[in-house]
Amino acid sequence: MVFRAGIGRIGLIRGLATQAAEVSATRYKSFKIYRWNPDTPAEKPRMQEYKVDLNKCGPMVLDALIKIKNEQDPTLTFRRSCREGICGSCAMNIGGRNTLACLCKIDQAENKDVKIYPLPHMYVVKDLVPDLTNFYKQYKSIQPYLQKASKPADGREHLQSIADRKKLDGLYECILCACCSTACPSYWWNNEQYLGPAVLMQAYRWMVDSRDGAGAGRREQLQNAMSVYRCHTIMNCTRTCPKGLNPGKAIAEIKKALAFA
């Protein structure tokens, strides 16, 4: 029995040594990244390849981008801030899907390239940085703040029941990363007039807030052919949302509110 136990320990040690050797070996992964520099407008956009050792890199795509920028190419440009899916800064198209680089895990298969582009159908500032000027202008247009004609008689904050507060769940969590809007074909075709899934979900968030007193005006603002009705329920918005929200459902609720107002 002692002999067998000894053999077991030797086997365990050999197994651990083998695992350590495997971990210490380099595992290079190819990242092909969209590059464009406005300072050299004559040069066309291109895909540039970088190799990253996965054994010396964090698990997320943003970790790889930061490693590339710090160690290989300081000219690589992208947005990032919180690194935990809260700010929405690092939204980009990874492997054909709009998502947040800080929440997107690196595929560990070394034979599969990771292709990274800026959010689609947006003007590009540089490399992976989209121009969100129009997106934020549209967000501003819905007046995303509490509007009340009068203050509470007792001077306190506007109270809200638990049931009314629950109506905001699945709406207020939006981080305005623009993943959903830039995945929407209707927004690609009409982004100057169609507000897009992200902005419309926020419009609905204020429409159903029991503390707000501008519901009629908010509905009237959306009562036209372009603001809401360009949504054709393709539902790319819901599929791509990195926060697991459902902009498509919010837009459907707006249409119902306008139809039965």
UniProtKB/Swiss-Prot annotation:
EC number: 1.3.5.1
Domain 4Fe-4S ferredoxin-type per the UniProt entry, residue ranges: 164-194
Every 2Fe-2S ferredoxin-type domain range: 31-122
GO biological process: aerobic respiration; mitochondrial electron transport, succinate to ubiquinone; respiratory electron transport chain; tricarboxylic acid cycle
Residue numbers binding a ubiquinone: W189
GO cellular component term, pick one: respiratory chain complex II (succinate dehydrogenase)
Membrane topology: Peripheral membrane protein
Catalysed reaction, written as an equation: a quinone + succinate = fumarate + a quinol
Sequence positions that bind [4Fe-4S] cluster: C174, C177, C180, C241
Record text on cofactor binding: Binds 1 [2Fe-2S] cluster.
Organism domain of life: Eukaryota
Binding residue positions for [2Fe-2S] cluster: C82, C87, C90, C102
Record keywords: 2Fe-2S, 3Fe-4S, 4Fe-4S, Electron transport, Iron, Iron-sulfur, Membrane, Metal-binding, Mitochondrion, Mitochondrion inner membrane, Oxidoreductase, Transit peptide, Transport, Tricarboxylic acid cycle
Keyword Transport tagged: yes
Molecular-function GO terms, alphabetical: 2 iron, 2 sulfur cluster binding; 3 iron, 4 sulfur cluster binding; 4 iron, 4 sulfur cluster binding; electron transfer activity; metal ion binding; succinate dehydrogenase (quinone) activity
Cofactor requirement: [2Fe-2S] cluster; [3Fe-4S] cluster; [4Fe-4S] cluster
Positions with a binding annotation for [3Fe-4S] cluster: C184, C231, C237
Family designation: Belongs to the succinate dehydrogenase/fumarate reductase iron-sulfur protein family.
Oligomeric and partner information: Component of complex II composed of four subunits: a flavoprotein (FP), an iron-sulfur protein (IP), and a cytochrome b composed of a large and a small subunit.
Annotated protein name in UniProt: Succinate dehydrogenase [ubiquinone] iron-sulfur subunit, mitochondrial
The organism of origin for this protein: Eremothecium gossypii (strain ATCC 10895 / CBS 109.51 / FGSC 9923 / NRRL Y-1056) (Yeast)
Name of the gene this protein is made from: SDH2
